[in-house]
């Protein structure tokens, strides 16, 4: 029976999985969009959603809880100072997972995970130029 099985193992030990999710969450908070494999993206979404919910609370205890999960002081600061306010009116669903084809080396399914209502200025200059060229997300 498949009772009480909540998360994917991702072929890693518990400590490796925990460290990987912390690193990926820090990268997602910093860049607001990352490319990874589909199972990792699906696992990262709820993890980051819970962190943003802590940031919306904005108290010291929430900041300490986020720090214990992310282990990156700069990203926790951005999480609480920027993202908590940005999503104050939204009840959940802070991340979006988009399928992005297959990786050439091993044909692994890839995905883009991004924050909803993300800031395009958080991306690099090359990405901004490409977005403007495609007529996609423009800065307001």
Curated annotation (Swiss-Prot):
Residues 119-133 have a biased composition (Basic and acidic residues). HAMAP family: Ribosomal_bL17. SUPFAM superfamilies: Prokaryotic ribosomal protein L17. The keyword Ribonucleoprotein applies. Keywords: Ribonucleoprotein, Ribosomal protein. GO terms for biological process: translation. GO terms for cellular component: cytosolic large ribosomal subunit. One of its GO terms (molecular function) is structural constituent of ribosome. PROSITE patterns: RIBOSOMAL_L17 (PS01167). Belongs to the bacterial ribosomal protein bL17 family. Part of the 50S ribosomal subunit. Contacts protein L32. Residues 119-140 are annotated as: Disordered. This is Large ribosomal subunit protein bL17. It comes from the Bacteria. InterPro entries: Ribosomal_bL17 (IPR000456), Ribosomal_bL17_CS (IPR047859), Ribosomal_bL17_sf (IPR036373). The keyword Ribosomal protein applies. It comes from Maricaulis maris (strain MCS10).
